[in-house]
Amino acid sequence: MIKQRTLKQATKVTGIGLHSGKKVTLTLRPAPANTGIVYARTDLEPAVYFPASAESIRDTQLCTCMINDDGVRISTVEHLNAAMASLGLDNLIVEVDAPEIPIMDGSASPFIYLLLDAGIEEQDAPKKFIRIRETVRVEEGDKWAEMKPYSKGLKLDFTIDFSHPMISKDVRNFKMELSAENFIHKISRARTFTFMKDVEYLQSIGLALGGSLDNAIVLDEYRILNEEGLRYKDELVKHKMLDSIGDLFMCGYNILGDFSAYKSGHGLNNKLLRAILANENAWEFVTFEDKEQAPEGYRIGEQVFI
């Protein structure tokens, strides 16, 4: 049986909030089987809890942001979400003492190390997957995102299209099948990116105060401003794929399907997830009693994190 997964022990890290520029402490705690992924604002009294759901995402302008009916928010959840999805985690309490997850280095890599350092253990309950049964597609202008049936895992195909001398056509597309190994080795270190003109505007209105060359790739009109350059030649499209993995995991379950996107972002990713879940014929819950019949990425994942 493919079993649910949680952490062996609690772990914490302190970093900077991308928008506030202030110190943020993130604590990850194990949770019982069938709890799901639950975010919590522990700086509030009483603490405010946000179970992972597509509907909790109510702001996607600059990141993926959970907001409840009282206006309480937790921003920038997508990179941590992507790390949890890649490791097949099912049950976790994510505590944060600020309105945002720390940005760390702008990638998912620090979260991967944090989770692996805590250790991952199986629980005595079957892991539920969402398996796609019908194709669902959403569009906004020339941008689109689509999910088709595919039972062997989560297949990903992402294309970006920026007019910039540093973004040539051969680094605008990336394809990958999600597994812990593929995620860790191929895209986990891909950092968020932005343009200098956007940074200047955001900081002028009190946003992105924690943004710097230490946690983002910054481009001007002609070049990349980071002295160390890129971590991968196609780092930008890989980060957009990383974002989409995190955005799709807001349902709280690993998805079995074939995802493809052109110029998609947080908003369109969330729109796709909502459209899938709203169509009861488009998906179903499945479990796997026989490990040999399970998606390969979840059969061999233990080798990565034990």
Curated annotation (Swiss-Prot):
Pathway this chain belongs to: Glycolipid biosynthesis; lipid IV(A) biosynthesis; lipid IV(A) from (3R)-3-hydroxytetradecanoyl-[acyl-carrier-protein] and UDP-N-acetyl-alpha-D-glucosamine: step 2/6
Question: Which InterPro entries does the annotation name?
Answer: Ribosomal_Su5_D2-typ_SF, UDP-acyl_GlcNac_deAcase, UDP-acyl_GlcNac_deAcase_C, UDP-acyl_N-AcGlcN_deAcase_N
Q: Tell me what reaction this enzyme catalyses.
A: a UDP-3-O-[(3R)-3-hydroxyacyl]-N-acetyl-alpha-D-glucosamine + H2O = a UDP-3-O-[(3R)-3-hydroxyacyl]-alpha-D-glucosamine + acetate
The keyword Zinc appears for this protein: yes
Which gene carries the instructions for this protein?
A: lpxC
EC numbers:
3.5.1.108
Q: Which domain of life is it from?
A: Bacteria
Pfam families from the UniProt entry: LpxC (PF03331)
Q: Which organism is it from?
A: Actinobacillus pleuropneumoniae serotype 5b (strain L20)
Named cofactor requirement(s)? Zn(2+)
- In Swiss-Prot or TrEMBL terms, this protein is called UDP-3-O-acyl-N-acetylglucosamine deacetylase
GO cellular component terms listed in the entry, alphabetical order: membrane
UniProt lists the family membership as follows: Belongs to the LpxC family.
Residues binding Zn(2+), per UniProt: H79, H239, D243
What the protein does comes down to: Catalyzes the hydrolysis of UDP-3-O-myristoyl-N-acetylglucosamine to form UDP-3-O-myristoylglucosamine and acetate, the committed step in lipid A biosynthesis.
What are this entry's molecular-function GO terms? metal ion binding; UDP-3-O-acyl-N-acetylglucosamine deacetylase activity
Keywords in alphabetical order, please.
Hydrolase, Lipid A biosynthesis, Lipid biosynthesis, Lipid metabolism, Metal-binding, Zinc
Q: Is Lipid biosynthesis among this UniProt entry's keywords?
A: yes
The active site annotation covers: H266
Q: Which GO terms describe its biological process?
A: lipid A biosynthetic process
